[in-house]
Amino acid sequence: MHNEAPIQRRKSKRIYVGNVPIGDGAPIAVQSMTNTRTTDVEATVNQIKALERVGADIVRVSVPTMDAAEAFRLIKQQVSVPLVADIHFDYRIALKVAEYGVDCLRINPGNIGNEERIRTVVDCARDKNIPIRIGVNAGSLEKDLQEKYGEPTPQALLESAMRHVDHLDRLNFDQFKVSVKASDVFLAVESYRLLAKQIDQPLHLGITEAGGARAGAVKSAIGLGLLLSEGIGDTLRVSLAADPVEEIKVGFDILKSLRIRSRGINFIACPTCSRQEFDVIGTVNALEQRLEDIITPMDVSIIGCVVNGPGEALVSTLGVTGGNKKSGFYEEGVRKDRLDNDDMITQLEARIRAKASMLDESRRISVQQLEK
């Protein structure tokens, strides 16, 4: 029931990664990267499909060798989500995966080779209508820029990016997006701000090597949140030393928190105190797990008492406010019913699923069907 975010997005060009539009007002795409050995085709395919199930728009796959390129061919045949091939050092690998139907090529200008090799990759991408991501990273800047600036700075990352943007411009190639990633939040944010003022190509956002599941999610939320709130960014990846599935979940949570793009349920829950009339924490944790398959956007407030419960329910799609033995249930801000506190999880799940089906007619079901 909350309004969309009052964020004016930066104007950018439109490109396509497979069938996914990037830039020019398209929904911000959420992506992740596999962490299996690419030569293990079965494991990589299984991980990509797991990422698809939680909503990944795009998946990146590292292709470090020609053997991995051959494995990529088999992987591409078994998945439907667009795949980006991550290429370092050997430009010939980019040419090989282009033959196998890659949807986007990610190259690092700091290590892909000389201008002639880049030209070869660009010509191939143009012929096969494959977009490119220029991926600048603070940890792998070109040697001359390291010497010039002494350490990674926003100006160094910008100069690296613009060097290769200019090269693609000279080659009359405009089907590309750019990233300027760093593990330091301030360095990354300022680099993206500078770049956003210089070009109108789509920008891929990320705080690289952000850390483990908790710290990395926090760091990414701060860095990406700052940029997104300023209208900067057309696609993103949350980089975590964790299951890649968690990257997709955190990515959507960031977009959901800024009301930029919603997928699934936005739970609003109190941190609990002695006033709670039912187990709020247990209820929320259980429902988050049970309802991961719901993709219909909706706000669900779960508040343990009547202090803030009615107010939150007023602006939620569905809401519950803790009461003695029974708790008030609200729909679209209107109190409808009372739910038994001892059976709260099952009752709420049924009502949430029924509401989701009402909002999505193709999956319409009834509360009675769910409560049997």
From Swiss-Prot:
Reactions that this protein is recorded to catalyse:
(2E)-4-hydroxy-3-methylbut-2-enyl diphosphate + oxidized [flavodoxin] + H2O + 2 H(+) = 2-C-methyl-D-erythritol 2,4-cyclic diphosphate + reduced [flavodoxin]
Claim: RNA-binding is one of the keywords in the record: no
Family affiliation: Belongs to the IspG family.
Name a single GO biological process.
terpenoid biosynthetic process
**Keyword Metal-binding tagged:** yes
InterPro entries in the cross-refs: Dihydropteroate_synth-like_sf, IspG_bac, IspG_bac-typ, NO2/SO3_Rdtase_4Fe4S_sf
Q: Which SUPFAM superfamilies match?
A: Dihydropteroate synthetase-like (SSF51717), Nitrite and sulphite reductase 4Fe-4S domain-like (SSF56014)
Pathway info: Isoprenoid biosynthesis; isopentenyl diphosphate biosynthesis via DXP pathway; isopentenyl diphosphate from 1-deoxy-D-xylulose 5-phosphate: step 5/6
Cofactor annotation comment: Binds 1 [4Fe-4S] cluster.
Instruction: Tell me its EC number(s), please.
Output: 1.17.7.3
> What organism is the protein native to?
Cronobacter sakazakii (strain ATCC BAA-894)
Which keywords label this protein? Answer: 4Fe-4S, Iron, Iron-sulfur, Isoprene biosynthesis, Metal-binding, Oxidoreductase
Recorded protein name is 4-hydroxy-3-methylbut-2-en-1-yl diphosphate synthase (flavodoxin)
Coiled-coil regions listed: none
* Alphabetized GO MF terms: 4 iron, 4 sulfur cluster binding; 4-hydroxy-3-methylbut-2-en-1-yl diphosphate synthase activity (ferredoxin); 4-hydroxy-3-methylbut-2-enyl-diphosphate synthase activity (flavodoxin); iron ion binding
What job does this protein perform?
A: Converts 2C-methyl-D-erythritol 2,4-cyclodiphosphate (ME-2,4cPP) into 1-hydroxy-2-methyl-2-(E)-butenyl 4-diphosphate.
Task: Name the NCBIfam families for this protein.
Answer: ispG_gcpE, PRK00366.1
Q: Which Pfam families match?
A: GcpE
Cofactor needs? [4Fe-4S] cluster
UniProt-annotated binding residues for [4Fe-4S] cluster: 270, 273, 305, 312
